[in-house]
Every structure is written in C-alpha cells, then in structure tokens.
C-alpha cells in the first residue's frame, strides 16, 4: 500500500484535470468521477486547515482502502466521504491545528465489526457528546455484524450507520486513549497516549448467550472508562 505522502502526490493529479491519472506507486489507479465531488466538498470544509492536494490524497487513499474491503458498493462514496473527513479531522487534531476540549478515545479490534463497535456505541451513548469516539480495525471486515447491532439494540444502544474502517496512523496520533481488543501488536505506539488492552472474546465466534456476555462486559468497561475520565454516564441505569 502506498504511503500517505504518495497519495498526496496523487492528490495533485486529482486536483488537475483527471480522475483516472496514475502515479508511480499506482500506475493504473482509476477513481469514479463522483469521487471528485467528495474532494470538492471536503476541500471546502477543510480549506482553513489543509491544501486541496492533501484533501484529495486522503480521499483517494480512503476510497481505495474501503473499496478493497467493501462488497456492497451502493454506499461506498458516502462511506469514503465520512472516512476521509474523520481522518482529516484526526490529522488536524494530531498536528495541533485545532484545539479539542473533549477526550479522544480510539477503540481497535481486528475486524472493527464486533468488540470495537460495541465499545464505541456504548461510549457515544453514555458520554453524550462529551467524548470524541473513533473505532478502527487492524484487518477490517466489510460490514458491522448484524448480530452485534441486534445485541446492542436490545439494551437501547444503536450503531447509527457505523461501518468497519482500516486503522491508520493519524487516528492513533489524535487519540488520548487507545484501547485495543485482540490486536495490540498491530497498533502503532506513539508517546503521550494511554494504551489499554481489553481482553475480550471475539463475540462473532460465540453463540447469542456468549455475545450478550461480551456486550455486558464491554458496557461495564466503558462505564469504568468514563469514571476514569471524570465524566458522569448518561442513562447508566439501562
């Protein structure tokens, strides 16, 4: 996989007149014309922070990362826009270009389809916007698992359109807490972050009873994390 610098150089090509141009690292890289709309929208959104070329490079790489894993293509452009925007937002945070007054928490598991999605959903639910939550996978699946979504829904927590995302450096650099679940060796280590490993079974390998047990354990750990952050959980009685 080309480096992000290579993709930024590719972004310069996207910023000219072609969405089918190549680069030394990707001589026949072709992107749908509609990706240009994503570039334009995000270039405007991040115009005070990043060059159009940088935005285009991140959009191109994000599209490629997702397209390699996503079987359902219907929402690929929407997912690309969300994924690229989140990565650019993380990059701005990591580089100190924006100031945050909320903790940044990153949950990482292997597929980003089970444990990390559960943890992210619970933390969003209980924190109520007082924590910035991201999730990622070291070898992400193509979709969040329906059994996980159903188990969360049983306790009043929703995934709200979340999807598996490949782990990238900038989201780790942006985090205050990096919590891994079965993939700690795959997560880059940067100074100044608190790294935690939650030893949890992969719910996708369990029956429904086992999956619910993991769900409840994740819930308990998220509530403990909120206590550590000094944030009172909302609706913790559920």
Where on the chain are the PLM-derived regions?
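Conserved active-site segments centered on acidic
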Residues: 90-169
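Conserved acidic residues
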Residues: 176
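Basic, alpha-helical nucleic-acid-binding regions used in initiation and control of genome expression
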Residues: 2-25, 34-37, 41, 50-51, ...
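A short, aliphatic-rich alpha-helical micro-motif
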Residues: 172-173
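Short glycine-rich anion-binding loops that position phosphate/pyrophosphate groups of nucleotides
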Residues: 113, 183-186
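Phosphate-binding/catalytic loops
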Residues: 26-28, 44, 187-238
């Amino acid at each position: 996989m080309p480096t992000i610098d290579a993709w930024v150089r590719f972004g310069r090509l996207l910023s000219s007149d072609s969405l089918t141009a190549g680069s030394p690292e990707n001589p026949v890289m072709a992107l749908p014309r509609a990706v240009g709309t994503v570039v334009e929208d995000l270039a405007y959104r991040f115009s005070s922070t990043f060059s159009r070329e940088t935005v285009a490079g991140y959009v191109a790489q994000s599209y490629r990362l997702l397209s390699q894993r996503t079987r359902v293509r219907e929402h690929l452009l929407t997912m690309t826009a969300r994924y690229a925007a989140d990565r650019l937002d993380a990059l701005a945070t990591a580089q100190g270009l924006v100031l945050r007054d909320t903790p940044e928490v990153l949950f990482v598991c292997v597929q980003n389809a089970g444990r990390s999605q559960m943890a992210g959903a619970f933390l969003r639910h209980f924190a109520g916007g007082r924590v910035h939550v991201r999730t990622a996978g070291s070898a992400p699946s193509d979709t969040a698992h329906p059994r996980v979504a159903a188990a969360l829904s049983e306790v009043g927590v929703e995934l709200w359109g979340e999807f598996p995302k490949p782990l990238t450096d900038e989201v780790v650099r942006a985090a205050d807490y990096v919590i891994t679940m079965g993939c700690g060796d795959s997560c880059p280590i940067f100074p100044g972050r608190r790294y935690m490993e939650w030893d949890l079974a992969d719910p996708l390998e369990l029956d429904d009873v086992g999956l619910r047990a993991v769900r409840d354990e994740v819930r308990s750990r998220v509530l403990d994390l909120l206590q550590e952050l000094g944030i009172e959980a909302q609706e913790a009685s559920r």
